[in-house]
Amino acid sequence: IGMLDINKDNISVDVARDTGFLVGFGIDVPNLNVMGSETDPRVIGHETSYASVEGGVTAMEHLLAREPDINVVYTINEPAAEGAYQALQNAGKTGVLVVSVDGGCPGIASVKDGVIGATSQQYPLLMASKGVEAIAKFAADGTKPSASDGLTFFNTGVNLVTDAPVDGVPSIDSDRGTELCWG
């Protein structure tokens, strides 16, 4: 497993996505607040992608230099995934599963095209509307927003988008993802 992060600064969104992927994949992460705290030998390394296509190419090249037989790549976002895919193609690698996060329309198109095997689709327009509702409610009567049950934040949901579903893992296909995508 190769990890393409934003950078090495442990930015909260980078850490949450990174550790969330690893835990979901069954990797023990001793410190959920620090990227790279895992010691599982299946994780070959973390590289900085700057969340860009160009950074994804460079980061993937570094991971391939370390482990040419890599077979799973996690990326912080879909532009980094596009770059990782380019580097894999340039190296003649096939059958490598690239997974990502965001679910914007270009990323869903990449799932449909087979560039990204799966992406976690978020809903920023729903996040924004719920935020505005919370502000209006607070302004009207002082009611503060509350976190979703069992969480420290308000959960607006997420869907895994893939055209290669796995039994036991809830997902939607790229056609449905296209109906729900943004950007």
Predicted regions, residues:
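A residue-level marker of the well-folded mature domains of exported/periplasmic proteins
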Residues: 1-183
